[in-house]
Amino acid sequence: MFPMVTQFMNYGQQTVRAARYIGQGLIITLSHANRLPVTIQYPYEKLITSERFRGRIHFEFDKCIACEVCVRVCPIDLPVVDWKLETDIRKKRLLNYSIDFGICIFCGNCVEYCPTNCLSMTEEYELSTYDRHELNYNQIALGRLPMSIIDDYTIRTILNLPEIKT
């Protein structure tokens, strides 16, 4: 065949292919047009976290036996446990316990392996500060229970559950 005819056929095939790709993109775009938005207006709306959400660690000072299991299982040796050996009763007495949330990776190993369940994960995830030294929580700060976002009437909570199609 003539070279001009083959070039014209290639041009026609490329035009049809381009139109098909544009049509596919248009169909995908239009299918998303009738969906609800996924974004939330953050300070005024918050998602309800899942049951197993790994937020800030809560610490109960009275339950801790200073066994240091949390330090041994932590991949970055993060919890700082200060204790004193009471020689008369041959037990450790906990003096200080602190975690630096600027370094913590929230893996949950300390909570999982704690033999006395003195550590637990909370639903609190707003830990941002202007000074990184404020992220070093001692046993008093770790012992505070977070305010539940469900109880806060100024914030609209949004349940984050996947839709079940029937």
Swiss-Prot record:
GO molecular function: 4 iron, 4 sulfur cluster binding; iron ion binding; NADH dehydrogenase (ubiquinone) activity; quinone binding
Top-level enzyme category: translocase
Cofactor(s) needed by this chain: [4Fe-4S] cluster
InterPro entries per record: 4Fe4S_Fe-S-bd, 4Fe4S_Fe_S_CS, NADH_quinone_OxRdtase_chainI, NDHI
Family annotation (Pfam families): Fer4 (PF00037)
Cofactor annotation remark: Binds 2 [4Fe-4S] clusters per subunit.
UniProt family annotation: Belongs to the complex I 23 kDa subunit family.
Function: NDH shuttles electrons from NAD(P)H:plastoquinone, via FMN and iron-sulfur (Fe-S) centers, to quinones in the photosynthetic chain and possibly in a chloroplast respiratory chain. The immediate electron acceptor for the enzyme in this species is believed to be plastoquinone. Couples the redox reaction to proton translocation, and thus conserves the redox energy in a proton gradient.
Protein name from the UniProt record: NAD(P)H-quinone oxidoreductase subunit I, chloroplastic
Gene: ndhI
